Amino acid sequence: SSTSSTSSTSSISPAREIVLSGINLGTYGRDLTPRIAFLDLLRRILDETSLERLRLSSIEPQDVTQDLVDLFASADRIAQHFHMPLQSASDRILAAMHRWYRSAHYARRLDLIHDRLPHAAIGADVIAGFPGETESDHAATVAFIERHPFTYLHVFSYSPRPGTKAAAAPHQVPAATIKQRARELRSLSDSKSSAFRRSQIGRTLRVLTLHRDARSISEHTGAEYTPALSTNYLRVQIPGIFPSNQWQDVAITSQEGNYLCGQILESDPPPLCESSAYSASLRYP
């Protein structure tokens, strides 16, 4: 009944952030009549809804244009977060994968984003051990990642899938080599992520609180905290217990593990309660 439907949804808070996801998001609308550009879809979402934050799950590098980056820079309701699949920085391997871009093209997109949005998160998917990948190919990928402003990587170890061209390709990379290369890439990802978190110390981030669980207790002080997510895809610990789906402004003071820590500047709404271990300075691990 309409009554039961109303009562079952009345206590649910509207989503303040929505992730727009799909395969090849940037090609949206090209098969429609009349044709619709992906950029127009984003503008309509911003213009015709009250959504407070829109995040893209991923976008191919060839779809990252000056106009798209300008929209991200001018609209504070779009999360400053780009996830662009890279897979490899060896042009030879990219060709073998039938990717539509090469490393120089990808690098130009990185520069476009970083020059306009220096604090944006930039993530990438990388595959270790694609058939035919030599030590030189792997080294090219590592060097490319080292010199560009990536903030995190999703590293995948290649594994053959029956019926695919790659599975039947010559020069399969030994499993032990794939494991070693993936380990090196993950270590590089950790280093990049840590450097990005450190670069945010001294800034104020507007974060959205997430659901707490039994693990939301500091290993260092025993203080309870509420996890939150920033526009640039960083995990932040807010001291105290807050409901989920709430905005908080946090002045970042330090990094502890994979989280950032800081001082609350505003509280909307106030904490449900304060932990007994909640420090007066509001600094937390």
Describe the predicted segments one by one.
Residues 1, 11-28, 82, 104-115, ...:
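Proteins enriched for Cys/Gly/acidic motifs involved in redox and nucleic-acid/cofactor modification
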Residues 3-12, 276-283:
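Short, low-complexity, charge-dense intrinsically disordered segments
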Residues 14-136:
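Conserved SAM/AdoMet-binding glycine-rich loop
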Residues 20, 56, 84, 125, ...:
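Conserved, mostly hydrophobic/aromatic
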Residues 133, 148-150:
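Contiguous mid-protein beta-loop-alpha structural module that forms a pocket-lining wall or clamp
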Residues 168-285:
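Terminal RNA-binding accessory module
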